[in-house]
């Protein structure tokens, strides 16, 4: 496959990129600014770059492919992919964890040196599930501390890092889609209180935006009383990534899971933020069936009401530690 071949040109087990010509992009992850990938002292990373979140995407892809193979009756392929994902997770922890920042490195450079910088990329690692549970919780705790969390959302780079600039495109700004993926990661590790905190921050930010529509990004200044978030002058609005953010935050808060094989929609440890008392979801589809739901908040708990179903479909709440 591409992942295990051209995607890993030096065979170290990590997917990486390297600019092929001088006119190409120096950085080829979602943070593709020229200065987005750097070391703790501010030096730009050079050579083949293995981004932290990309390894998580590979891990998640192999686990999902293993599930597909098992459903298709290809058990040997399923076991192979599952084993590869497990080995990748072990290799990942050894190579990317940086005790000096109590988080995962932003990337490995061409010499396999970790970029020991606190960034939101580590938050996206939680979304993919590759992080060990104890380390995931430590990363999550950092994401909601003042170095990252402004009251409006989570910055792309912590405020005490060398290249931090709250007005930078990728080095200190707040990207709604980035926050949404982090929220899914928080939910994955059972941190629903943190999900609610992040949900409220972005909802509050949206109330200051034109048409209450979250833009591509906005500046990473700290929230102040009687002042809204500082807009990024050339941010796209509307923007596809950002437009999905409210739905993704709701997915994270409710713990929505879709099990097509069982014809079941599950709400895992659902929790609504304090500003949201009730949500009605219409035409929630699973295959050819659909359901309308009402979720009501009662303190830190929720009540679920099935308003209407079409076709064969089950809905359940799963409460787990």
Write out the residue ranges for each language-model feature.
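Glycine- and acidic
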Residues: 43-46, 179-184, 230-234
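Catalytic cores of secreted or luminal carbohydrate-active enzymes
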Residues: 235-280
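Well-ordered alpha-helical scaffold segments within catalytic/enzyme domains
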Residues: 54-75, 124-135, 179-194, 248-257
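Alpha-helical scaffold segments in carbohydrate-active enzymes
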Residues: 1-5, 57, 64-67, 80-98, ...
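Aromatic- and histidine-enriched alpha-helix N-cap/loop-to-helix transition segments
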Residues: 49-60, 117-120, 170-181, 237-244
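Active-site-proximal binding-pocket segments
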Residues: 172-179, 189-198, 206-214
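Beta-rich accessory regions
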Residues: 68-95, 99, 186-197, 262, ...
């Amino acid at each position: 496959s591409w992942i295990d071949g051209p995607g890993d040109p030096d065979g170290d087990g990590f997917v990486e990129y390297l600019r092929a010509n001088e006119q190409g992009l120096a950085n080829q992850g979602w943070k593709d600014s020229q200065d987005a990938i750097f070391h703790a002292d501010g030096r730009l990373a050079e050579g083949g770059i293995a981004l932290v979140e990309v390894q998580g995407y590979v891990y998640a892809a192999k686990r999902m492919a293993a599930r597909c193979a098992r459903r298709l009756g290809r058990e040997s392929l399923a076991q192979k992919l599952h084993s590869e994902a497990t080995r990748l997770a072990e290799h990942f922890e050894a190579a990317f964890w940086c005790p000096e920042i109590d988080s995962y490195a932003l990337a490995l450079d061409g010499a396999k040196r970790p970029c020991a910088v606190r960034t939101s990329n580590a938050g996206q690692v939680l979304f993919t599930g590759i992080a060990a549970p104890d380390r995931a919780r430590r990363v999550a705790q950092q994401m909601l501390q003042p170095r990252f969390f402004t009251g409006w959302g989570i910055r792309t780079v912590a405020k005490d890092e060398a290249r931090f600039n709250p007005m930078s495109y990728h080095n200190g700004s707040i990207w709604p889609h980035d926050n949404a993926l982090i929220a899914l990661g928080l939910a994955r590790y059972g941190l629903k209180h943190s999900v609610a905190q992040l949900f409220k921050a972005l909802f509050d930010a949206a109330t200051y935006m034109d048409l209450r529509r979250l833009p591509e990004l906005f500046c990473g200044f700290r929230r102040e009383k009687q002042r809204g978030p500082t807009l990024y002058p050339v941010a796209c609005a509307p923007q596809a990534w950002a437009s999905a953010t409210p739905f993704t935050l709701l997915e994270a808060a409710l713990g929505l899971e879709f099990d097509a094989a069982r014809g079941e929609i599950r709400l895992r440890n659902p929790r609504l933020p304090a500003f949201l008392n009730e949500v009605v979801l219409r035409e929630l589809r699973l295959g050819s069936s659909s359901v309308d739901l009402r979720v009501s908040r009662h303190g830190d708990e929720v009540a679920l009401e099935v308003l209407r179903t079409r076709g064969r479909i089950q809905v359940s709440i799963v409460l787990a530690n």
